[in-house]
Amino acid sequence: MKLSLVPIFALLSTAFALPVENAERDVPIEERAAAPTVTIASPAATIIGGAGATVETFAGVPFAKPPVGALRLKPPQPITSALGTIKATAQAASCPQFFFSTTINDAIPTSALGLLLNTPVFQQVLNAGEDCLYLNIQRPVGTTASSKLPVLFWIFGGGFELGGTAMYDGSSWVAESIAEGKPIIFVQVAYRVGGFGFLPGAEILADGSANLGLLDQRLGLQWVADNIAAFGGDPSKVTIWGESAGAISVFDQMALYGGDNTYKGKSLFRGAIMNSGSIVPADPVDCPKGQIIYDNVVASAGCSAAANTLTCLRGVPYSTLLNATNSVPGLLSYSSIALSYLPRPDGTALTKSPDLLLASGNWAKVPFIIGDQEDEGTIFALFQSNISTTAQLTTYFSDFFFHNAPTSVLTGLLNTYPNDLISGSPFRTLLLNNWYPQFKRLAAILGDLTFTLTRRVFLKTALKVAPTVPSWSYLSSYDYGTPVLGTFHGSDILQVFNGIKPNYAASASKAYYLSFVNTLDPNNGTSSAYANWPQYSNGAQLLNLYASFGGFISDNFRSTSYDYIVANLPSFYI
C-alpha cells in the first residue's frame, strides 16, 4: 500500500524553499476594538497589537537580531538598537522546517490518517524563513502595566525539526483563565529547529555554535524578564511549558549552565510543565553520529572542499542549506525518533548529558508537572513494517539508535517486552491493533525509552536529589480505543491545548494547569469537580485522565522494563 499525502503537503515544499527575502507576514489578526499599545524599553519600541472580544494579541514581536548572513548558525544576538513602532498584528515566519516525503510507503493505516493530519506536526507551513526569532504575546483585554499577571511561556514541539508559533493559539487559555478568575498572560517563543538550530559536529562545537535552538529559547525568556511587565505580566511569576521537544526543552532550560536560570540576579522562571518529554540521554555534539550528520550536510551543500566548511555553510543560498540540512534521516521516517538533530552536551550551555545533570542536582529546582500519553510510541512505530522478528528488532535498535550498546543489552531490553499479540502499545487492547508483526512491541519500547519510563526515571531521580521540590505527574488515556494509535503522542495538543473536544479531560487539564501557573499548586483554587491531585512524593500516584472522568493509578507498570532501563542507562544514549 502506498498512501499519497501530496494533496495535504502540496504547498509544503514550496513554502520550505522560499528565500528569506520572500517570506511574507500577511496573516492579519482580527481587530475588533481599539488597538492595544505597549511601550517597552529593552529594546526601545512601541508595539501595537490586535484586540479581540476578550483577548489582546501581539504577534511577531522580535526578540533577537535576525539570524541571517554572518549570524546564520550563530548564537542569537539581542537587539540593541531602538525599533520604533512595531505593528504586531501578523504572524512572523516560522523557522526553516525539516520537510519529508509526501508519499509514505505502508506507513499510516487509513484508520489513523485522519487523526494524524489534525496534529501540528502534519500541518502545512506556508511561511518559513531564516528571519524567524519572534514572540507572540496574548493577554486579557484591559490588562495594564500594573496588572502583574502570571505568565505561561510556551515552547512548541516537533522533534527539534518542525514547528512554529503560528501552529498554536493561546487565546483559549487566556479566555479560560479569565473565566476561572485566574488571569494569565500567554507567551510563545520561536526557536530554530533542524540543522539551523541543532547542527552537531566538531566544527560547530569549536565555533561555540551548538544548541542554538535552546539559546534562542533562553534569549526569549530574557526578553520576557526585561519587558513583560510593560504588558502587565509579572516577570517573577513565569512558568515554562512545552510538549514533546518543547517539554524536553523545558528541562534543558532547567539544566542550562549547570542549573543557573538567573538573569540580572533574578530567576527567569519559577515553575515548569512538561507534556511528553524530560531527559534525553545524549552523546556530545562532536560524537561520531553527530559528525556524520555534519559531514553529510556539508557534502550536500557542496562545501566539502572548502577551507572552512562552516564558513561555507554560512554563505550558501538559503535553499541550498535548507536542502542540505534536510538530506539526513528525519523524524517521520524509518529511523523514527533516532533524531539527527537534538540538544547534545556542548560543555558550555548544556554542560553534560541531561540525565547526568539531573542526577548531580545541576538543575533549577522549581515545582513541576510532568506526564505522558498512554501510547506515546505508536506514531513513531508506523514506518517499520518490514520488522517481523526479535532479531530484526535488535538490529534496528543497534543500527539506528544505540550504536554503543552491546547486543546482549539490547536483547535483554527486548526480553522485558513480551513477543506476543496481546502485549504492547496501544496498551490494553488484547489482540487488536497489531499493524505489523512487531508493531505493538516496538511502539511500547519507543514510547517507554523516550517518554513514559524515562519520565519515571526523571521523577524518581528528582525526588532523590531534591526531595522538597513539589512535583505532580499524570498519564492520559482519553483516546483509549482509537484504532492503531490509542492515546498517541501529540494527542494532548488536540485535546488539551486546542480543546477540540470540550470534555472532562480538557477542562480538568486547564483547571489544574491554570492553578499551577497562578500558585505553583494545581489544586489551589481548583474546582471541587476535580479531585485533589497528590504530589508524586505521596505514593507515586499518577492522575489518569479519560475523556469523561479521571482517577489515579500507581506509577509501577512495566516495572521489569523500568528496572532494566535504569540499570543500563549508559547504553541508551543517542
From Swiss-Prot:
Active site positions: 244, 376, 489
> What transmembrane ranges does the database entry give?
none
Q: What happens when the gene is disrupted?
A: Impairs all extracellular esterase activity. Does not affect host cuticle penetration.
N-terminal signal peptide: 1-17
Q: Where in the cell is it found?
A: Secreted
Described function: Secreted lipase that allows the use of hydrolyzed lipids as carbon sources. Has highest activity with methyl umbelliferyl oleate (C18:1), whereas much lower activities are obtained with the respective esters of palmitate (C16:0) and stearate (C18:0) (24% and 12% of the activity obtained with umbelliferyl oleate, respectively). Hydrolyzes 1- and 3-positioned ester bonds in preference to 2-positioned ester bonds. The production rate of monoglycerides is lower than that of diacylglycerides. Seems not required for the penetration of intact host tissue.
The UniProt similarity line reads:
Belongs to the type-B carboxylesterase/lipase family.
Q: Which Gene3D superfamilies match?
A: alpha/beta hydrolase (3.40.50.1820)
Which positions are glycosylated?
323, 386, 524
Is the Iron keyword given for this protein?
no
What reactions does this protein catalyze? a carboxylic ester + H2O = an alcohol + a carboxylate + H(+)
Can you tell me what the entry says about the temperature dependence of activity?
Optimum temperature is 38 degrees Celsius.
Organism from which the protein derives: Botryotinia fuckeliana (strain B05.10) (Noble rot fungus)
Q: Which Gene Ontology BP annotations are present?
A: lipid catabolic process
According to the UniProt record, which cysteines are disulfide-bonded? Answer: 95-132, 303-312
Its taxonomic path starts at: Eukaryota, Fungi, Dikarya, Ascomycota, Pezizomycotina
Q: Does the keyword Transport apply?
A: no
Give the main EC class.
Answer: hydrolase
- Noted pH dependence of activity: Optimum pH is 6.
Keywords noted in UniProt: Disulfide bond, Glycoprotein, Hydrolase, Lipid degradation, Lipid metabolism, Secreted, Signal
Name it: Secreted lipase 1
For this protein, the record's Pfam families field holds: COesterase
Reported induction? Expression is repressed by glucose or other simple sugars such as sucrose, fructose, galactose and mannose.
Source domain of life is: Eukaryota
